[in-house]
Amino acid sequence: MDEIDNIILHSLRQIGCTLDDEVTSLDEFSPTLLVQVVSKCITLIDSSLDLPRTLPPGMAQRFTATASLAEACRTIGYRRDIGYQTFLYSNVAEVRRVLMFLIERLPKESADKAAGTGQPLDVTTELESRICASLQSQLQAPWMPEFCRTAAGPSSSQIAFRRFVPRKLNIPFVTQGDIAAEVKEFWSRQASLDTLDEDSFIPSVIAANDGALKASGGAIDEVDRIKVCSPVDRLQRFYTSSEQKSSVVPVGKVAVEEKLDALAIVEAARPGKTPLESLQEEIDQIRVEIERAVGEGTGLEGERMEVVELCEVQRAAVGKLKDEKKIKERTHILLEDPEVNVRKLQGIIGAGGERMKKLQDQWDVHRIPLEQELEGYRVKHSDKLSQSQQIVDQIEATRHKSEEVMMDLQTKSAMHARLQKELEKLNRTVSRTAYTSRILEIVGNIRKQKTDIDKILQDTRTLQKEINTITGQLDRQFTVTDDLIFRNAKKDEHAKKAYKLLVTLHSDCAELMALVQETGAVKREIRDLEDQIETERSRNTAANLAQICRDLAEMQSESQRLEESLRAHLR
């Protein structure tokens, strides 16, 4: 039955019924959900019927709505017993029969909805299909630059090739001829590019740059006509400037090295070597000088760090010496006039003792009342301390219990996560082919059971025929035996006793057979009663009776409220 319920739930989700993922069987169907599902199915079967979509809150309206649904089911061809109790006080068997009938009567376009994938059309599946379709369309579309794309999206039929057109800055009255040049310049300086929109920003900047180049007379074409100095000319100018400096600055080690370097560069730049080779030699010499300067800088940095560490050590030593100096100065001051200093110290010590005594008296004045008050509070709250201790013990016990519960919760959470992963790995949406194969398997099992039942019935009939045959033979043999013994019973005393025993045996056998037949009948009645009990249990009679009692009480309360409102209205 679980597989049949899964097939029914799968079909209901395919036609658009709103079912939660937690609903896995028909036992979890509430009256409200059952009314919604049945109304949806009947609407798809016959859209001309006016049916309630949901279950009303009032009991009278509920009876009316469910009765109309039952009448609609009978209208579309349901032949079994159905009424308001099927929806309000239903059992799983009746709900299964009704839903199977409705699913069989669904139109083919509704029944085959989403059959291409064999999966339910939930929100996640629909979103994934839309994302896949969008990605596929984007991958199939040709690539275009950003400025060639239209607002409607990259489509081959909507490509618009737009040429670049610069725009002037949005400065008022700049193009007018009667405005002074100073005013135009002021407006150009004060106009902010932040106020422009995105379409005019870059073209305006380019237009402003073109205007500045034009005003300075530096056209782009004139750049090619600028004479670029060759490396030889630059080296000759450097050599000339170095000679002029050497005539003014005293000759030193650095000046001599610079002169030698310049001479080497000039010698390298003389005819016989290309300008590129001369520049390469100059670069090599400069690189050597840089490496030498870096090495000297590294050495100086190490010396600087050593000097800094030495300074730190000297500062620490100076601090210690200053502290010792202060102590020795104070000792020296005391030793200059010992008697006077001793008297001063004794006076200070005496004043400190008197001050300590006064402070002790003041402390006692405040301490004694506070201690008495504290003792009173301690006695007063001794019971509360014991209660607090009990509460602390309870809290500790509760803490231990909560720790145990947390450990148990962690274990169960880990188990739940593991089971959830295993559940996600399983294929929850079985295809229609699997359902069909399972249905065919169930049909095959039913046919096999029918064959077994027919075989049992045939064996029973054969056995009954054999029993009837043997019974007939036994009756005939008894009749013949009775006749023979009865003839001899008149002459022989032993034959007479045998005849009596034969009659007794025959009556006992007949009684025994009657008892066996009655026992079989009683067993059949017991099986019938057990089947009836199981049927009544499956109908949830007790739960339905309790629900009927609650609905009756609710209807009585509604009737009482209506009567009271009617009386109040009549008054």
Swiss-Prot record:
Family to which this protein belongs: Belongs to the CCDC22 family.
InterPro entries: CCDC22, CCDC22_CC, CCDC22_N
Keywords (A to Z) from UniProt: Coiled coil
Top-level taxonomic group: Eukaryota
Pfam families: CCDC22_CC, CCDC22_N
Higher taxonomy: Eukaryota, Metazoa, Ecdysozoa, Arthropoda, Hexapoda
GO biological process: positive regulation of ubiquitin-dependent protein catabolic process
Alphabetized GO MF terms: cullin family protein binding
Coiled coil segments of this chain: 406-434, 509-571
Statement: the UniProt record of this protein carries the keyword Coiled coil: yes
Descriptive protein name: Coiled-coil domain-containing protein 22 homolog
